[in-house]
Design a protein with these regions (language model features):
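Short, polar loop motifs at secondary-structure junctions
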Residues: 45-52, 107-108, 128, 207-208
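Short, hydrophobic beta-strand segments that form beta-sheet elements in well-ordered domains
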Residues: 39-48, 95-97, 123-124, 202-203
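Catalytic core and acceptor-binding pocket of nucleotide-sugar-dependent glycosyltransferases
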Residues: 148-218
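Short, P/G- and charge-enriched loop/turn segments at secondary-structure junctions
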Residues: 71-73, 139-146
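Extracellular/periplasmic catalytic domains that process cell-envelope and extracellular macromolecules
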Residues: 6, 116, 148-150
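GT-A fold catalytic core of metal-dependent nucleotide-sugar glycosyltransferases
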Residues: 60-62, 80-132
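Residues that flank catalytic or metal-binding motifs in active/ligand-binding sites
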Residues: 8, 39, 81, 99, ...
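N-terminal anchoring/stem segment of glycosyltransferases
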Residues: 1-72, 89-92
Length: 218
C-alpha cells in the first residue's frame, strides 16, 4: 500500500456532552497526548457546555444545536460525534485525529497517519468480520451499499477538508425522517464507514492506544 507522508502538524479532536466527563478528564487526555506526540499543533474540544479550567491548549467549540439532540447523545448513541465533519466546525488547514475521552494513550498516536493511502483516507479500527479491502468495496458496490466493512469510531484519522459530506448527508437523512430507518444510521461508526467505504483504511489492533473492551465488540 502506498502511504502518504506523515503531517508536520495535525489537530486532535475531542467531543464531550452530558455530565460523565469533566474538565479534569479532558485535561488529562490532552496532557498525555501532548507528551507522546511531537507534531500535534491544536486541540479542539467540541462540547455542549462551557468547561471551566479547561487546558489553555484546548480550543473550545460549541456542539451545533442540530447535533445536540437526545437521539444523538443519549441511550448509548454517539451521533453527535458526526458534528466534527460539519463544514466550518473544524479548521481545514491540517488533518485530524479524533479520539474518545475514555482512551488510554500508550504511545505516539500520530503514527496512525502512516496508514493512510492518501490525504482523503479515513483510518479506523475494524469492528466487524468483513475487513476494509478491495473485496469489501466490490461487495459494497454490488449490493448497492447494503454490505460494507465497518470501523470503530473511538479513534478516527481524517482530514476535515474532504469529509463535510458525512455531516451533510446525515442531516439530510435525518430531516427526511429516515434516521435509524436507514440502517447505516443506527450508529455513527456504521454511518461513517458507509459514506467513506471507498476510502476506509484499517488500523492494526496492536496500535498504541487502549479502549475499554466493550468499544471493541460492536
Amino acid at each position: 500500500m502506498k502511504q502518504t507522508e506523515r503531517p508536520k502538524k495535525w489537530q486532535c479532536v475531542l467531543t464531550c456532552w452530558g455530565t460523565k466527563y469533566s474538565s479534569t478528564d479532558i485535561n488529562k487526555l490532552i496532557t498525555k497526548i501532548a507528551e507522546n506526540n511531537h507534531h500535534v499543533a491544536r486541540f479542539v474540544v467540541i462540547s455542549d457546555r462551557v468547561h471551566k479550567d479547561l487546558d489553555p491548549r484546548a480550543e473550545p467549540v460549541g456542539l451545533p444545536d442540530i447535533f445536540n439532540k437526545p437521539e444523538f447523545t443519549t441511550g448509548g448513541q454517539c451521533h453527535a460525534k458526526l458534528s466534527m465533519f460539519q463544514s466550518g466546525l473544524l479548521k481545514a488547514d491540517m488533518p485530524a485525529i479524533y479520539i474518545d475521552l475514555d482512551t488510554a494513550i500508550l504511545g505516539p498516536i500520530e503514527q496512525a497517519f502512516d496508514f493512510r493511502k492518501d490525504e482523503k483516507s479515513i483510518v479506523m479500527f475494524q469492528s466487524a468480520v468483513l475487513p476494509f479491502s478491495a473485496f469489501a468495496r466490490l461487495l459494497f458496490r454490488l449490493t448497492k451499499g447494503k454490505r460494507y466493512a465497518r470501523g470503530n469510531s473511538s479513534f478516527v484519522v481524517f482530514h476535515p477538508k474532504y469529509w463535510t459530506e458525512i455531516a451533510d448527508k446525515f442531516l439530510a437523512i435525518y430531516e427526511a425522517g429516515e434516521f435509524c430507518k436507514f440502517r447505516p444510521t443506527i450508529s455513527d461508526e456504521r454511518y461513517i464507514s458507509w459514506v467513506a467505504q471507498d476510502d476506509m483504511v484499517a488500523l492494526p489492533n496492536s496500535f498504541a492506544v487502549k479502549f475499554p473492551t466493550e468499544y471493541m465488540q460492536h
